[in-house]
Each structure stands twice: as C-alpha cells, then as structure tokens.
Regions:
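Extracellular and secretory-pathway beta-repeat/beta-biased strand scaffolds
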Residues: 1-210
Length: 210
C-alpha cells in the first residue's frame, strides 16, 4: 500500500507463484496511481500470479485499487494463469481511470487470465470497475482465455466512458473471451457496462469466440 504512486518499470515484476502442492498467495495493491511500463525492457514487466506445471496448487488472486490512474503500457501486464490441475486466480481492479496501451510493443499488454495447453484447471474471472474514462489502445487487451481442458473465466468491465482503438500495429485491441481449438473447456461471459460514451475504432473489438 502506498499513499501516492507505485511504478513497476522495465523488467521488474510483482509475483506470487505456486511451484509445489501449496497455493500461491494473493496480491493486493492500493495506491493513488499505478503504472506498469515495459518501455526499454527485454523481459516481462508485470504483476502476476501463476500456478506452474510442476505444482498442484492454485494461483492467487490479484486485487488492485487505485484512486487515480491505472496505466499498463508498452508490455505492462496484470496476469493470472495456470499450467496444471489448479485454478488461475481472479483479478479485481478498481481505478479512477484506466489506460491500456501497447504503443510500439509487439508482445502482450493489458489484463489477462488463462489456463494453458496442458492444464485442467479453470481460468480466473476478471472484474474491472473504472469510475472515469477507460482506454484500450493498439494491441492491448482485457482477455480471458482457455487453451486447456478447464473453462475460461467471466469478464465484467464497467467504466463511465470507454474507447477501444486498435490503430497502429495491425492487431486487434479490446475485451475478449476465447476458447482455443485445442481446448475442451468453455469460454467465459463478457459483461460491459458503459453509461457514458462507448467508442470502438479500427481493429477494436468486444468478442466472445470459440
């Protein structure tokens, strides 16, 4: 918990992982502004909880509460996933404003929960509550996906105003729930509540796909 700002910068991370029979612990972050920025990094820049292949436990939940801005940019991510029989953790975000912007980064930027190819556990739910404006730009995503035998988690997204704009990299930006061809699981539902303006441009999308 910080009274002002928290910044997670290039090649830095906050992580709680499961490697054995126990569960990973929860991550709880409270600050005025939170920025996860992969600019200049060569590796992962993220807040994550993962249940790895050799483990039997569950990944932990991630709770982020910012009274000001939450910015995930240029490869910055919030991630939960599972590679085993355990489940991925849920992600809860409460923010004054939200910016997900991959800029020129070709890798993942955004908020993700998934189960991977060899897993039988379920992906976690994603719940995002933004008091003001939210932007999902270039190839950034809010994504719930299943690649294994488990189910993808549900996605709930609320913001006063939302812009989804895939301009720039030729890759879609948006909010999605995906079931891969290799998966035996079911996709999660998507609920989007925007009482103000909802703008979707270029390769922007809100999609539930199998």
């Amino acid at each position: 918990q910080a009274g002002k700002d928290i910044r997670v910068l290039a090649d830095s991370f906050v992580a709680s992982n499961a490697y054995a029979s126990g569960n990973a612990g929860a991550i709880r972050i409270a600050s005025h502004n939170l920025t996860v920025d992969g600019t200049g990094g060569q590796q992962l820049t993220q807040i994550s909880s993962q249940a790895f292949y050799v483990s039997q436990g569950n990944a932990g939940s991630i709770d982020v509460n910012t009274s000001g801005a939450l910015n995930l940019i240029n490869g910055g991510k919030i991630v939960t996933d599972t590679n085993n029989i355990g489940h991925a953790g849920d992600i809860h975000v409460t923010a004054g404003s939200l910016l997900l912007d991959s800029r020129n980064h070709v890798g993942l930027t955004g908020i993700y929960s998934s189960n991977d190819f060899d897993s039988t556990g379920n992906g976690g739910a994603i719940n995002i509550q933004v008091a003001g404006d939210a932007q999902i730009l270039q190839s950034a995503q809010v994504s719930s996906a299943t690649w294994g035998k488990g189910h993808a988690g549900d996605v709930v997204f609320r913001a006063n105003n939302l812009e989804v704009n895939g301009r720039g990299l030729g890759v879609a930006a948006g909010i999605s729930s995906e079931v891969a061809e290799t998966s035996g699981g079911q996709g999660g539902s998507i609920t989007v509540n925007v009482p103000g303006h909802l703008k979707i441009f270029d390769l922007g999308l809100i999609s539930a796909a199998t």
